[in-house]
């Protein structure tokens, strides 16, 4: 009946918004008042907003981790959605475990860090009550939810999470094993990372980025955003963390190791903070003109500068 979400970034606000939209009591915590203000704005004004009805945001109570973490004792499900960093997640769970009430369930929204690494050395009381609930972005639009148990996760916890997420939140729950990047990201991130590398070769050969996005979208059964637009939605910072996670966990000889680092020009974007929609600019950005209209610009990886984005017709493609 109630959900505490810890982490007010893209995924945390998405999860909190979905729960609020379905009329559940929600607590959303982040590291600072400034972060909470950004989370509030993201819930109402994000692209897309986390709630369809702005009034539903009234179901959310906001607070900071330092001041309000003890409030989790009042909530049935505690969902961690902080940065994709193992030490950060472990430190949070160490603080969280003594505060939650008996009978509550816990989950981590990690997109690929094995649960066994997160819970190593933690109390058995936590290990039996925790699972991975891997939502996909944007949370309210993506039906897929991966649910992953640890070695000691109670069947009752798995059943409770599966029932709530499937019936109350309307997700299609896929049960996966506790392996690196699980199922969706093990396939999808390999596609995206290899795509960035091969697309960079095409860009260097003079192929427009819009043509690459047009081809690597609906014709391949993929989102209409295309490759670059999809990564703008996910965030280059997330892609970089996924690559680092793969570097640690993939076995020697795995083909994925050839593509885990971002191509040079794209890594420079990451260093500048040009990481995607949540930063206001990634491969694409929206510019407001003097007459109030908007135009889409694309960051040309060949020239290293912004230019107007051109609509590419697939009929114009050449072999």
Regions found by a protein language model. Give the residues of each.
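N-terminal glycine-rich phosphate-binding loop for ADP-containing cofactors
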Residues: 1-319
């Amino acid at each position: 009946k109630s959900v505490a979400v810890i982490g007010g970034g893209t995924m945390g606000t998405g999860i909190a918004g979905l729960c609020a939209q379905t009329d559940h009591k929600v607590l959303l915590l982040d590291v600072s008042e400034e972060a909470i203000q950004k989370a509030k704005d993201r819930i109402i004004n994000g692209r897309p907003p986390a709630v369809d009805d702005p009034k539903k945001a009234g179901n959310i109570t906001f607070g900071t981790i330092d001041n309000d973490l003890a409030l989790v004792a009042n909530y049935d499900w505690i969902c961690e959605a902080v940065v994709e960093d193992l030490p950060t997640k472990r430190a949070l769970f160490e603080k969280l475990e003594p505060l939650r009430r008996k009978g509550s369930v816990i989950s981590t929204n990690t997109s690929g860090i094995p649960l066994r690494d997160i819970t190593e050395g933690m109390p058995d009381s936590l290990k039996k009550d925790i699972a991975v609930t891997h939502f996909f972005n944007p949370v309210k639009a993506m039906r897929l939810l991966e649910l992953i148990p640890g070695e000691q996760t109670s069947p009752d916890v798995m059943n409770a999470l599966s029932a709530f997420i499937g019936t109350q939140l309307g997700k299609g729950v896929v049960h996966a094993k506790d392996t690196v990047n699980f199922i969706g990201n093990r396939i999808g991130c390999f596609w995206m990372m290899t795509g960035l590398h091969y697309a960079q070769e095409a860009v260097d050969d003079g192929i427009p980025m819009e043509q690459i996005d047009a081809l690597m979208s609906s014709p391949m059964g993929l989102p209409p955003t295309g490759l670059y637009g999809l990564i703008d939605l996910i965030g280059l910072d997330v892609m970089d963390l996924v690559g680092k996670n793969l570097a640690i966990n993939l076995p020697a000889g795995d083909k994925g190791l050839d593509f885990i680092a971002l191509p040079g020009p794209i890594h420079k974007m990451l260093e500048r903070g040009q990481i995607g929609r949540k930063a206001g600019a990634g491969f694409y950005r929206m510019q407001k003109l003097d007459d109030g209209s908007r135009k889409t610009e694309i960051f040309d990886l060949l020239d290293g500068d912004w230019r107007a984005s051109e609509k590419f017709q697939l009929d114009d493609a050449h072999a």
